[in-house]
Amino acid sequence: MRKIVVAAIAVSLTTVGITASASADPSKDSKAQAAVAEAGITGTWYNQLGSTFIVTANADGSLTGTYESAVGNAESRYVLTGRYDSAPATDGSGTALGWTVAWKNNYRNAHSATTWSGQYVAGSEARINTQWLLTSGTTAANAWKSTLVGHDTFTKVKPSAASIDAAKKAGVNNGNPLDAVQQ
């Protein structure tokens, strides 16, 4: 009887040890979360004005891709580079990310750059919510107005022409602080 009890205790302890070691390895949860973020971020995204953001989220936390603006004087696609949190929180928070586009390509050099910073939010209606800064080269006297500020929400669903027109008419994201003063 004693041998049976000892064997039963040994089996129980082994089971507890295996269960504890499987759940005590947070790196497995983190790796799974990172893979979900990587797969979710990668793809084609559209903002409310119809600009197209094509991105690849790499396992090392880098972002690479192109950006095609639907507004301003930008022509064709521009290279983008950025970073994302490749070890995101596992508490349901968004995944922090950011990228930059220098508005120079084979067609045009606008002597400006835009940086977006925000969060990727996973789910059935995945989105990337961002704030952006657009800085243009200016003279020292005009440096005070060299940077515009705005926000974009990107989704994987291209907006309709009607919703783009409505956003433009509403003045969404023109980023010019002087427009608010002049109205």
Curated annotation (Swiss-Prot):
Residues reported in the UniProt entry to bind biotin: 67, 78, 116, 132, 144
Protein name listed in UniProt: Streptavidin-V2
- What is this protein for, i.e. what is its function? The biological function of streptavidin is not known. Forms a strong non-covalent specific complex with biotin (one molecule of biotin per subunit of streptavidin).
- Keywords of this protein's UniProt record, alphabetized? Biotin, Secreted, Signal
Q: Which InterPro entries match?
A: Avidin, Avidin-like_CS, Avidin-like_sf, Avidin/str, Avidin/Streptavidin-rel
User: One GO CC term of this entry?
Assistant: extracellular region
Q: Note whether Glycosyltransferase occurs among the keywords.
A: no
Give every Avidin-like domain span.
Answer: 37-159
Instruction: Give the chief site where it resides.
Output: secreted
Q: Where in the cell is it found?
A: Secreted
| Pfam families on file | Avidin
Q: Does the keyword Transcription apply?
A: no
Q: Where is the signal peptide?
A: 1-24
Which protein family is it in?
Belongs to the avidin/streptavidin family.
| UniProt lineage | Bacteria, Bacillati, Actinomycetota, Actinomycetes, Kitasatosporales
Q: One GO MF term, please?
A: biotin binding
**Sequence motif Cell attachment site, residues:** 83-85
Under the subunit heading, UniProt states:
Homotetramer.
